[in-house]
């Protein structure tokens, strides 16, 4: 097992992922997160509205403009009960809340845990009919935490590229669970199914699978010729690790995780919290 200490990885600010390319604007976006803060949602809206990086903090006027520009275009799905209490003005909190869909899941059984950003950018020049799609998937929540996060950004390409198996179906399922009315985004899903994606040279297959909503969802099939495996996860279970270890035989395997002592402590805390019954009001 290789332990990652303090050497920084190359990074890309999450807001830069959301910001439209030159000559384009955000036409539609679907963001999912486990937890969120309204300031994090505000920062995302400013980026989606094209706010420059050096002004990413935004002024009240910039935020009001972003809200007006993106209303009905941007949808943020968060686990119910995991939206932090507002730390912005009440009027602005109401405006930001209009972008949020709280997904009801009993966390004693399961939670809403996907973190994705799927964005369609439309040209500012209406004579140009070509939109551009961008897809991010990773571990970051819409909060101000400074945890070490990992994500991948894929861009639409007009030549070559690959299909992302399961993406359109997964987004449809997630959006429906979040409460979006299917007819309000059917055009986007229809268009998404035909998109080809530019991926890193070493990526041979890309597929999106939803875990937790179906008992028959399993790990992907073992690709041919695997000679190295990297597993990144803060929490682990013996069964999954055992299955993944068979992918490479005696070849190189890398596990990026928390230190075992901390991981065990966190797992126990999560387990105890999951078993804890909701408190009952006391009767005087």
Language-model regions, residue ranges each:
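PLD/PLD-like phosphodiesterase catalytic module centered on the HKD motif
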Residues: 1-284
